[in-house]
Amino acid sequence: DSSIVVAAMAGLSEKPVKTFSIGFDHERFSELPHARKIAELYGTDHHEFVVSAEMSDVLPKLAWHYGEPYADSSALPSYYVSRETRRHVTVALNGDGGDEDFAGYVRYFAMKAARLYDAVPGPLKRVIMAGAEYLPEKDAPFSTLWKAKRFLRSGIFTDVSQRHLKMICYISEEDKQGLYTPAMLAAMGERRAGERPDAANYLAHGFEHAKGQDFVNQMLYTDVVTYLPECLMVKMDIASMANSLEARSPFLDHELMELAFRMPGDWKLKGLRGHKWIL
């Protein structure tokens, strides 16, 4: 997404565009090599920065800026890349929104594949899940096995909002409930048997509002009205403004988003592999 933004900027600018990228010591999670290729391709004035474990010292400061519990670990690199970028410019463009407009997340594949998994009989699903639970997990939540287990767990649900919730959650509903005090639970009201978890209800509104769309666009719409504004945009807004940097997201232009949602889901998610196919 950022690469497309850079390409557009380079095509409109008479001088080299300034680009900024942040990476990690661990190559598996670093996008710096790709960023360098894009910078070379478009002849940008490129700046790189690497986040190390020692830089977690800034966490108390970040907690102050966010002012409430915030669980996205990328708040840390977002803060640092904003700080480094502000040393050179006052306004920067980013690629936020591209994944939600054009189906860029792996979970969209998983949700689509889960509909095929629905054909597997329930008893067989339970046998498969029971066997998978005995397999050891490494590097969770990043290992392939951990993701496979999450997929199998989501297959238990037929309710699309609960399945979507299972795809994006890192803790179980039981563990989450265990964090609440009795007073908090009383304030929330007792949940009736068979009732959706509160988080699943929240996601269900997105799917219900997008009933006229195909399944892929229903997923995208749900993320556009939940994950995008309440996680990604919050993260970038606070991380950038904490460093007096104005961050702008071209993919969030309302006319572009309206155009994206007039496109059929198959233009974005082709089969089970071609994500962001139209791009």
Tell where the protein language model's regions lie, with residue ranges.
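ATP-dependent adenylate-handling active sites, centered on carboxylate activation for C-N bond formation
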Residues: 1-196, 215, 238-279
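A short, charged helix-loop
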Residues: 196-207
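Acidic, Mg2+-coordinating catalytic module of metal-dependent nucleases/exonucleases
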Residues: 208, 216
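Basic, amphipathic alpha-helical recognition segments used for DNA target recognition
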Residues: 225
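Globin-like tetrapyrrole-binding proteins
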Residues: 228
